Amino acid sequence: MVSTNAGGIASKQASSMAPNPGKATILALGHAFPQQLVMQDYVVDGFMRNTNCDDPELKEKLTRLCKTTTVKTRYVVMSEEILKSYPELAQEGQPTMKQRLDISNKAVTQMATEASLACVRSWGGALSEITHLVYVSSSEARFPGGDLHLARALGLSPDVRRVMLAFTGCSGGVAGLRVAKGLAESCPGARVLLATSETTIVGFRPPSPDRPYDLVGVALFGDGAGAAVVGADPTPVERPLFELHSALQRFLPDTDKTIDGRLTEEGIKFQLGRELPHIIEANVEAFCQKLMQEHPQAADKLTYGDMFWAVHPGGPAILTKMEGRLGLDGGKLRASRSALRDFGNASSNTIVYVLENMVEETRQRREEAAEEEDCEWGLILAFGPGITFEGILARNLQARARARD
Amino acid sequence: MGDAAVPAMVVEEEEQEHVFRSRFPPVAVPDGVTVPEFVLDGAEAYADRVALVEAAAGGRSYTYGEVARDTARFARALRSVGVRKGHVVVVALPNLAVYPVVSLGIMSAGAVFSGVNPRALAAEIKKQVEDSEAKLVVANEVAFDKVKDAGVPVIGVGDRERMPGAISWDGLLAAADRTGAGVVPVDAAQQSDLCALPYSSGTTGVSKGVMLSHRNLVSNLCSSMFAVAPETAGQVVTLGLMPFFHIYGITGICCATLRHKGTVVVMDRFDLRTFLRALVDHRVMFAPLVPPVMLAMVKSPVADEFDLSDLALKSVMTAAAPLAPDLLAAFQRKFPGVQVEEAYGLTEHSCITLTHAAGDGHGHVAKKSSVGFILPNLEVKFVDPDTGRSLPANTPGELCVRSQSVMQGYYKRKEETERTVDGKGWLHTGDVGYIDGDGDVFIVDRIKELIKYKGFQVAPAELEAVLLSHPSVEDAAVFGVPDEEAGEVPVACVVRRHGAEEGEEEIVAYVAERVASYKRVRVLHIVDAIPKSVSGKILRRQLRDEFIKRMKPSA
């Protein structure tokens, strides 16, 4: 058995990119989802039935709005059992923040634990080897924070060094990678576990025909958890997926009202400005150019078409506008669009699902010996409240080495 | 009579009750297990053995490992999309290998499986979806167009391209594989919960949902499998030709075979070549059939294309339709090693109620023309339909049965339920029959179908048996039509054997020679076919209505 294993690793490494010494790499990824699956095609019918509404015009409008999200399935924590245990959540104007946090706190820890365990299994190492924990969530609030609850649920060492990134919204996943990268590169031998976990329970509102736009928000967002193990200088038994070469963050002045979330007694209330896709479109290229300058050789050698694009799919409009602005061909954002289709916008988690899709695409290309080559270099991007841009210039280490000269 | 006399009378009445029980000792019914748990108990040890295989060329098959896995996956998928305890899922599938996985998955999720004939009219399927307040429908290409506008989401098994708008079975299962546990746990299914809502055949009255609990089905399986030898576990190959949407198909064939870890050879529609090929190739040992299939086995020249000398077939079983004596004789001549069994069961009693099948070594074979003996754990009595009093042996009365397999009632039909299951738990079957001194039960007829000729009762089945004994008669049905003078008169529809030349009068005369004068057939029609239900029952009510309609203009 041992020799077979070793042979497998040797052959894998032979055809993969070598990581640069001292640079942080993603060594494994993982995910977990809650119990309820929402089939988007049936959201409208269910909504119309639950609200005893048979206005055909409203139904058509909702159907159209649901389709435009391009989401086919999402996973949510909210269930019949929760509504039975907490009937006040379905009533307007009830002070329910406490109940929402009770459910959320439990759910995010449960999902983060499952995602972390799946990730560590895929990594092949032991939980005792984890030196740092970076925990990202915008769905919980408590003392001690979710980072401690997760460390305890996983049985991590009491000496594990914890960081929690709270209320970073959709850019939180990439922010977490940036922080994990910093820790991994500054502490030799560190193995950093990054976990993201989100639920829309805090913002759940009962469906109401008076607020059709609510449904678009509900129809777009999903719940779940993601995880990654990050470390530099992989051992021979580790299989690095991406090298995190350089990470940048930027906020756009005077856009702090565009993504607006307020905690109220009735839960969190979000407002997304309609101008959001336009603001991203107008500012994304300069940010990408700055990231590309971080390339060790002459950055001008890299073109958009030469790179892979792991973009947080905040919504279909953001992806379409990016494609248009940067002139990306339709396949470039495939991993992002698939994640949006299968999981919705799962906030900070989504970038983990996008990266998992890319690993799978690379694996399939390799298996099918496809003509199409993987791009070695690429960008990992996310946009969050602020408006904040998070970006990482990365290398796909599973890409086949191109024949040079 | 003073007040004190009342209890004394009750006691006296109870003393007169003629209740019959099985000659075999009672069998234990396990507590606390659901149907899927009971049926798949011990499946791990048979993980690589074939549980279900489609007879058609290139058909799908499932091992026990796959059945257990996909049953759990589908249950999880149903819960993930919000299906909960008590929710009904209508299944509009033909006989496919996946069928038992679908129904066990539904039950495992705590939901209620309601099978419907995929070849029924769209309006009939829609009626069942609406009456049962189903949350979901499972269908394949056969019924998709009929169910797509029924108002509930459809899970499509099979070719996605041909079922636009359906939730893909594979896609749903894959999506649900990713789901985790709930924050507030889902209510698990209890043995007392409903698990099936078959609609009773509709040969009499309106089609009604029959509410069956896990306990009902588990106890029925325990009773009907009482004589199954443990040492044959994993060896029995059963033919799955009877429709699975019918209670007998899903419990009597699928659940019983899976419980015993045998193999079900799944056939959708009957085709003699595929059928014989399946008997030969899959070494089928037990085949529940309808009489026309046995007729084809005996008479069709197609049968000569196969070497049937080395069949593994041990027994065939017919239920719900009487077997013509000459067909039985011809069948036994051609297949001397095959035991022909009859059974009697009804949906309201979770399936089999009386049977011939005691297996080897139990020392009792019921008489040919009987429907069998009483199964363990059951109580049976025969009541006078007019007085309601129970009758002694050898006296025909309405067959009543009491056991843990008696349904919980008709769905949303309290009145009909009360008319069918009395306060003491007796299920009134509507069938007239009697028990003989050996404990063998004979069914005379349906109460409602008994013909009342000048105050005499005439049993259609008796006249049909006489007609079927005529060498030129291939099939026959008898029913009563209103008559000014007699009240009702017996009318027969007859299918003549190919090449037979006897006229209507000759056949009428043939019957007259063999029955009492009040039983004579008064009108006889030669027809092309006799309409039957999927389980093989003659649709006498339909024949009667058609006959009356045809007669009216001339009257």
UniProtKB/Swiss-Prot annotation, chain A:
Q: Mind telling me which GO cellular component terms the entry cites?
A: endoplasmic reticulum
EC numbers for this chain:
2.3.1.-
- Could you tell me where the Polar residues compositional bias lies? 1-18
**Active-site annotation:** 170
Q: What are the subcellular locations of this protein?
A: Endoplasmic reticulum
Mainly localized where? endoplasmic reticulum
Give the span(s) annotated as Disordered.
1-20
Q: Name one GO biological process term.
A: pollen wall assembly
Effect of loss of the gene: Defective pollen exine and Ubisch bodies patterning, shrunken and aborted pollen grains, and male sterility. Male sterility and defective pollen walls. Altered composition of lipidic and phenolic compounds in anthers. No significant reduction in sporopollenin accumulation.
**InterPro entries per record:** Chalcone/stilbene_synt_C, Chalcone/stilbene_synt_N, Polyketide_synthase_type-III, Thiolase-like
According to its UniProt record, this protein's enzyme class is transferase
Give the top-rank taxon of the lineage listed in the UniProt record for this protein: Eukaryota
Q: In which tissues is it expressed?
A: Expressed in adult flowers.
MF terms in GO: acyltransferase activity, transferring groups other than amino-acyl groups; tetraketide alpha-pyrone synthase activity
Keyword annotations for this protein, in alphabetical order, are: Acyltransferase, Endoplasmic reticulum, Transferase
A Pfam family in this protein?
Chal_sti_synt_N
Q: What family classification does the UniProt entry report for this protein? A: Belongs to the thiolase-like superfamily. Chalcone/stilbene synthases family.
Instruction: Fill in the subunit field for this protein.
Output: Interacts with STS1.
Function, as annotated:
Plant type III polyketide synthases (PKSs) that catalyzes the condensation of fatty acyl-CoA with malonyl-CoA to generate triketide and tetraketide alpha-pyrones, the main components of pollen exine and potential sporopollenin precursors. May be involved in the synthesis of sporopollenin precursors in tapetal cells to regulate pollen wall formation. Required for exine and Ubisch body formation in anthers. Does not possess chalcone synthase (CHS) activity in vitro with the substrates 4-coumaroyl-CoA and malonyl-CoA.
> Know the name of this protein?
Type III polyketide synthase 10
From Swiss-Prot, chain B:
What Gene3D superfamilies does the annotation carry? 3.30.300.30, N-terminal domain of ligase-like
Q: Where is this region: SBD1?
A: 271-342
Q: What CDD domains does its record include? A: 4CL
Q: Where does CoA bind?
A: 269, 454-455
Disulphide-bridged cysteine pairs: none
EC number of the protein: 6.2.1.12
| Superkingdom of origin | Eukaryota
Q: Does the keyword Ubl conjugation apply?
A: no
Q: Where does (E)-4-coumaroyl-AMP bind?
A: 248, 320, 343, 347, 448, 452
Q: Tell me, what is an example of a GO biological process annotation in this record?
A: phenylpropanoid metabolic process
Catalysed reaction(s) here are: (E)-4-coumarate + ATP + CoA = (E)-4-coumaroyl-CoA + AMP + diphosphate; (E)-4-coumarate + ATP + H(+) = (E)-4-coumaroyl-AMP + diphosphate; (E)-4-coumaroyl-AMP + CoA = (E)-4-coumaroyl-CoA + AMP + H(+)
Q: Does the keyword Membrane apply?
A: no
Residue ranges for the region (SBD2) are: 343-410
Q: Name one GO cellular component term.
A: endoplasmic reticulum
Cite the PROSITE patterns for this sequence. AMP_BINDING
What cofactors are annotated for this protein? Mg(2+)
Q: Which sites bind ATP?
A: 200-204, 208, 342-343, 347, 431, 446, 537
Molecular function GO terms recorded: 4-coumarate-CoA ligase activity; ATP binding; long-chain fatty acid-CoA ligase activity; medium-chain fatty acid-CoA ligase activity; trans-cinnamate-CoA ligase activity
Name the top EC class.
ligase
Q: Which InterPro entries match?
A: AMP-bd_C (IPR025110), AMP-bd_C_sf (IPR045851), AMP-binding_CS (IPR020845), AMP-dep_synth/lig_dom (IPR000873), ANL_N_sf (IPR042099)
The protein's assembly and partners: Interacts with STS1.
Q: Which family, according to UniProt?
A: Belongs to the ATP-dependent AMP-binding enzyme family.
Q: What is known of its domains?
A: Both substrate-binding domains (SBD1 and SBD2) are involved in the substrate recognition, and are sufficient to confer the substrate specificity.
Task performed by this protein: Carboxylate--CoA ligase that may use 4-coumarate as substrate. Follows a two-step reaction mechanism, wherein the carboxylate substrate first undergoes adenylation by ATP, followed by a thioesterification in the presence of CoA to yield the final CoA thioester.
This chain belongs to the protein called 4-coumarate--CoA ligase-like 9
Q: Which gene encodes it?
A: 4CLL9
